[in-house]
Amino acid sequence: MQLEVLDINNKKYMVLNELSDDNETYVYLSNIKNPKDFVVRKVDKKDKDVLINLDNEEEFVKAMELFKEANKE
């Protein structure tokens, strides 16, 4: 398995997971140097190579619930 690393604001983040729900694809990332720096972005529908911010706190909660459900034991 190859580790995918993305550069965001001059910081290197590894992709932890990528999950889809309701026509959205969320990407969960952790800073390689600081694992407490955890971010969630979504794939831009117009350009699949672009990650964009979530729309609001409600969408963040939804994305985190999806992550929690996908990572249950």
Segments predicted by a language model, with ranges:
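Basic, polyanion-binding surface patches
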Residues: E18-D49
